[in-house]
Amino acid sequence: RGNGKIIQELEGEFRGAGWNVIKLLWGSNWDPLLARDKDGALRQLMLDTLDGDYQAFKANDGAFVRKHFFGRDPRTLELVSKMSDEDVWALRRGGHDAQKVYAAFHAANSHVGGPTVLLVKTVKGWGMGRAGEGKNTAHQAKKLSDDDIRYFRDRFNIPIPDSELPKIPFYKPADDTPEMKYLHERRKALGGYLPARRTRCEESFTVPSLDTFKAVLEPTAAGREISTTQAYVRFLTQLLRDQALGPRVVPILVDEARTFGMEGLFRQIGIYNPEGQKYTPVDKDQVMYYREDKAGQILQEGINEAGGMSSWIAAATSYSTNNRIMVPFYIYYSMFGFQRIGDLAWAAGDMQARGFLLGGTSGRTTLNGEGLQHEDGHSHILAGTIPNCISYDPTFAHEVAVILHHGLKRMVEKQDNVFFYLTLLNENYAMPGLKAGTEEQIIKGMYLLEEGNGGKKTP
């Protein structure tokens, strides 16, 4: 990115999105120069200089900076005419000026009315000197020479004698020093010395019995065939009616609510919008119109799989971050799940997320009308790479109900750190219903659906 100016690029993006932008670019010892820059020559030079040049300046010395930066304009060269090369070299970037860093954070913390971003200019490998400061090799430096270590010690005033330097001893200030007192005060004010992660929620819930979902478990009547996607929606609808656990359910959609037959939930629980619904939806005269509400429960993310997955992760880790159990159900076209947001799915595993991912319209034959790019026959291969992701590809409605119920028992009652992935179909066919006693086999992945007819055996 040496040909560009990343800070100005980011500033434009954040300001365009309505953010408050604070730029921390230059240290305090630049202030006298800027005060004497009556015609704006130094400011213009700063704006015209590319990021690649700024890196090169800090990879050399004061004489180089004088010639190749200030020397680009006679007016700026005159500004530093009475400064030594050492003084020129000592001109700091804003991110290395403690007072300005404090002032920037104070300004950000004091701002009201919107989010604030700090764009801070620093030096790669700051403090390493010739061993890596401002150099691309800073990332590859595995060890420092004795001279480089001595420079680092002197640069940061670390009180270690030359005789001890070859051992590279760990330095810890005495407990009664201002530095240590400050650190202890801040840690206590921030709640402790080590980052803490809650592994179990103090809340507890009892999952409704499997019989609660009998509408999904029973055989379908002749002429009333359904898909496994419809089976999921019926299960979810029933779960939402549970007085205890229902309010903790977080249905998440990314644009496909009507594709999955979930529009009935618009009226039942509404779509969450912190501002309510300021417009009249075009389908207002319908029973299942698009209803947004401040108290809505559905998260409708638009065409934004990464946003939907991020919302899912937030709810799926609420047991740890908020000590509050939430049960997110995120449904999407299965081709746009692990294939598109695989890194987030892996991160969810790292974070010990608990919840359900539902890959709708799965398979290679049920969504050709929208193009081959929708044909998913491999999301389970990707899901299988995440150790705590438990995946199923159910065929029948009762399997969906048994698996979802089992997942609730594990994640809500037992608080196991796993999450579930189910692929769902949109093809309607007859559902045989649950045969008593097969629940455990369904969870294991194989069960006897029906006896064979005793036909001729192959030799």
Region spans (language model):
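Long, well-ordered, tryptophan-enriched scaffold segments
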Residues: 2-219, 441-445
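Short gly/pro-enriched beta-turn/loop segments at secondary-structure junctions
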Residues: 11, 111-113, 386, 415-417, ...
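Thiamine diphosphate
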Residues: 75-95, 99-103, 110, 168-442
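Short, flexible, glycine/charge-rich loop motifs used to bind or transfer phosphoryl groups or to couple energy/partner
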Residues: 108, 382, 448-451
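C-terminal catalytic subdomain
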Residues: 132-135, 140, 147, 418, ...
